Amino acid sequence: MEDFIYYNGKKYRKGYTTGTCAAAAAKACVEMILTQEEVSAVQVTTTGGTILEIPVAYQKFSKDKATAAVQKDGGDDIDATHGMWIFVDIDLTDNAEVVLDGGVGIGRATQKGISVAVGEAAINPAPRKNILATVRESLGENRGAKILVYAPEGEERAKRTMNSNLGIIGGISILGTTGIVTPMSDEGWKKSLSMELEMKRNQGLDQIILVPGNYGDDFVQNTLGFSSGNIVSMSNFVGYMLKETQRLAFKKVLMVGHFGKLVKVSAGIFTTYSKDADARAEILVANLALLGAPLSLLQAVEKCNTTEAAGELIEEAGFTQVYEVIAQKIKARSERFLKFTKPSVEIDVVTFSTERGLLAATKDIDVLREEWR
């Protein structure tokens, strides 16, 4: 696929999704059955309406059956499914019905709350509709087919995805809102996080714990002793996920994260990628100065490369109250971020250090334990 975007001055090639791969393989199967000839490439219309020519990596056919595979090409976006083969088997039937299922390496939904019913193959609604429409268009109105999508590497590749968090077990998902993979785009990642949040809400939860990543998850479960069932990753998308909690009408949010990540939010930085915004030292220095810290401490903290290193100096100087001040500012900034939209969301914050453990919380920890048990 020769389509490009530019990001930070660099040129990146776009790719296509697992859903587009499955639709292309399905079309190749139908064409081989109807023509009794091998097909090396097919034209498909993606879920977003883009017409692509997709190479077919594997072909096998007989009078009423065919198998085809398309190799997933994510362009310059090297995700968990890049390079794997997506297979489709098609068997023609005597009735006019076209049915679709997933086989080996395609996950199955085991929990309510996502767009796939419990027990069904993890083929999302948009690619499902596209695969069925592609086959129907190629096959005509009067013939039927059984379509099986499978991916021999799927179970292993799925370990690198968020599927297990969503209750999708046994393989990858067939995805693709537009059918196109855009390199350096965070949209797919954010959508996955939103799906997990929606699943929790649909299961009846009205309060949620947001963590930036594994450190936060581990601290919530093993230090605070809270249930893992309330935890959802927000990654670097703090603002986006806060807006999502409001959209989904969660009543309470508890943000738990390493101080070096959450400190940015106290200054209104709601996307915490270090490449986009890093003001950790500046925020610490400003707040220490407001507490009356000596110039020597401010200068030393400013030179620190990490908040862990700064923490050692802050502790030695006796200014650990700065953590409580900043935790309250994280809470205030976050609630102000959601202030002008309804419904209101109550937010609390817990920050920690890998070396020093709990640093600060906006409520007494025992009170939080009672609220979140």
Curated annotation (Swiss-Prot):
Record-stated family: Belongs to the CbiD family.
Encoding gene, per UniProt annotation: cbiD
GO biological process, one term: methylation
Top EC category: transferase
This enzyme's EC code(s): 2.1.1.195
Pathway(s) this gene product operates in, as recorded in its UniProt entry: Cofactor biosynthesis; adenosylcobalamin biosynthesis; cob(II)yrinate a,c-diamide from sirohydrochlorin (anaerobic route): step 6/10
Domain of life: Bacteria
A Gene Ontology molecular function term of the record: cobalt-precorrin-5B C1-methyltransferase activity
Protein name as annotated: Cobalt-precorrin-5B C(1)-methyltransferase
NCBIfam families: cbiD
SUPFAM superfamilies, sorted: CbiD-like
Record carries keyword Methyltransferase: yes
Signal peptide: none
Pfam families in the record: CbiD (PF01888)
Keyword Membrane (UniProt): no
Keywords annotated in UniProt: Cobalamin biosynthesis, Methyltransferase, S-adenosyl-L-methionine, Transferase
Catalytic reaction annotation: Co-precorrin-5B + S-adenosyl-L-methionine = Co-precorrin-6A + S-adenosyl-L-homocysteine
